[in-house]
Amino acid sequence: MLGPHLPPPPLAPSEGRPTPCAFQIPDGSYRCLALEAEESSGEEGLQGEVGPTDLEEDEGVSRSGDDSACRVTQGTPQLPKALGIQPPSCSREEQGASQHDDRASQDWDVVKAGQMMTASPSPGPGPRVAQKPALGRSTSLTEKDLKEAKARSQQIAAQLTTPPSSNSRGVQLFNRRRQRVNEFTLESHGQRGQKPSQESLRVLPSSLPGHAPGLSLSSTSLPEPGPPRHPSPQSPDRGVPGHSMEGYSEEASLLRHLEKVASEEEEVPLVVYLKENAALLTANGLHLSQNREAQQSSPAPPPAEVHSPAADVNQNLASPSATLTTPTSNSSHNPPATDVNQNPPATVVPQSLPLSSIQQNSSEAQLPSNGTGPASKPSTLCADGQPQAPAEEVRCSTLLIDKVSTPATTTSTFSREATLIPSSRPPASDFMSSSLLIDIQPNTLVVSADQEMSGRAAATTPTKVYSEVHFTLAKPPSVVNRTARPFGIQAPGGTSQMERSPMLERRHFGEKAPAPQPPSLPDRSPRPQRHIMSRSPMVERRMMGQRSPASERRPLGNFTAPPTYTETLSTAPLASWVRSPPSYSVLYPSSDPKSSHLKGQAVPASKTGILEESMARRGSRKSMFTFVEKPKVTPNPDLLDLVQTADEKRRQRDQGEVGVEEEPFALGAEASNFQQEPAPRDRASPAAAEEVVPEWASCLKSPRIQAKPKPKPNQNLSEASGKGAELYARRQSRMEKYVIESSSHTPELARCPSPTMSLPSSWKYPTNAPGAFRVASRSPARTPPASLYHGYLPENGVLRPEPTKQPPYQLRPSLFVLSPIKEPAKVSPRAASPAKPSSLDLVPNLPKGALPPSPALPRPSRSSPGLYTSPGQDSLQPTAVSPPYGGDISPVSPSRAWSPRAKQAPRPSFSTRNAGIEAQVWKPSFCFK
């Protein structure tokens, strides 16, 4: 995405190192990456991207691992060390310097051709755009093209250095969130402090993602490549370092990506994207922390492998036709790390595929090489391809997959992406790798770049591709989209990475995993570009959330969600390289000729189709909403007209039934009901006005009308709407029945109080008192309270509840306490003897606590009314109560019983409810006491 500002590099590689090119990206994360690069390998010269078009394609970011400098110059000039942009493959310690030189020479030559393709096809500041379709890598780029690419890359870098709309609300919010996520992820990984020193080679994968700052578009869009690539056991090693650097550079890149998404992506609103991206970043950050820890613990060679894959990827990008030779040599030179990069040679076999596909694959390969999740996948695929060091194999295999899928075709596009990758290698690599994985599925070689196993890659890659795509989705999409959005013409690499990977991921997961690379690539280039652009954030996040949890998700190649997106896109499968440059592809006609070089079918359509299709989708969506609204609006006026003119129409017609029937069909059940009601009225009135026969008819109808006024709506509905009307009529009848029942129930409630003289009192007492005591109190005591209650009940309206509630407060507690002891005595003697024991029992209760005496008083109150009913008992009980309690207690109990009842009479409903509840509450308390 970010074209490094590089002087026209010599066509011949300088010791496998690209000529130094300076990225003008004052990014803090970028600087940190540079520091890491210097610390990790002071000897290496960072590869610079020749240009957004040329550099991305040619991007061979080379980084020397300890002894050997990774010379992945795909014709790309060296990047200044300060840039901190080092190829993930730079840590290839196994590769010899001579091998690097060979690669550099081969790759550089290829880059020339790719750059020429890129520069010539893209008239606008579209080195990115031109690179995307740059299918003919064989053609050498002229120095003018290189200069143009440099200028374009400088412009892009300047733009990227300062977010285009940093003041936008969405960007600010996203930046805050991303900072939080980065703090969490980097701190958890311990990479902020570790990046410069601890992660030298290991960080190279991460520093490559860290390089993403220069390449912020691709790096940001690949902010969390590591987690998506978790599927492979070694993905944590890569993903973690890559993520730290990516996180650091994500702040600028993700913000730009969000802006781009807002402008280009219709499906995913900015807020939604930010939320999803933040969730992915958080989830990926966890994965990255784990992965980084694993990577740090794991031997240095895996990081070296990661770097070497990046170099290979860049080389592959640089040389579409020479990709086979150079990547093959590279893979043979670096069995562990080179293989990943060698995949581009393997991909060379599918060179027939459009260059854009190769570019995607190579950029993806670079991303995996950066030390992002791809490492884990490569290990799985490596088993298929070559026996390499486990960590190295894994990463290499990932790169292989990416490059193999579209070796020659993808080279131009991928080199474009590679150019972006140098600045943000790990993030871009993650994102790119995911798209490459998808593209690669048919051609991706499983682990052996040396073997050029395009066939094998096609067979084995699908699994690997899914895994890598998943990783890529996490971070890179945001970066790439961000870059593309703010600028009408975005760096093709960054945009292609962001847009491609989601699309490729979806397409490959759902559709493309089995599909062969070459045919799918042309499909990619055409319309999927735009669709991919809109989809990338959602699909990437979704895929990442689903896949990242387990390395097992690699089979997600069969993942359904991405296919749905593919379905949404007319050419969803294989717009990966187009995806990143939807905007610029449209702007640049050159990409069309480039795509036509390898497969001109899809590329021109994709360019023109991206903006047009996006506009069409937007327009179609808007039209859909308006269309839905319009039908809603039209029926409403019709209903109004029908309702208003129903009477007139019916009058005009001798019989309004026909009109009514017609109207209900058009308007619906409810509308028909309203209209039908006037219809019978009209029928009656015109019948009366008509001649004698109509009068007879009116007489016949009149009874119907009389009977109908209530059922009319139902009958009319039944006539007009059928089942609907019948159901409606049934509902109405049921409602009426229920209403009647409720009215009947209310009188029943009123009736209940009248019999309450006997039953209600018993009902009230049993609810309040324990079972045994209820029986005892019912006969003697309840009748007089019933009379008292009845007197109060009619006043309150609800007689039962009040008396029960009033006693329950006072009587229930004492009864409950005494009930177990008194039940035997009281049940047998209901006369004064039970009252006395009750008083005796109450006496001990009084000292026990304040509550028992109050209940005791109410209890005698109950007994006292019962006794009062029978004069003999009255005399007995007061005497019995008075000696233990004293003269005060006996009067207090009746006073409390009577006065509170009289006072509480107005509270019947509340008292009844509370009484039942309180009785239950009191029982346990007294029993426990």
UniProtKB/Swiss-Prot annotation:
Expression across tissues = Expressed in cerebral cortex.
* Glycan attachment sites: 330
Q: Taxonomically, which superkingdom?
A: Eukaryota
In this chain, composition skew of type Low complexity spans 317-332, 685-698, 826-839
**Any one of the GO BP annotations:** spine apparatus assembly
Where would I look for the motif PPxY motif in this sequence? 562-565, 581-584
Name this protein carries in UniProt: Synaptopodin
User: The organism's lineage?
Assistant: Eukaryota, Metazoa, Chordata, Craniata, Vertebrata
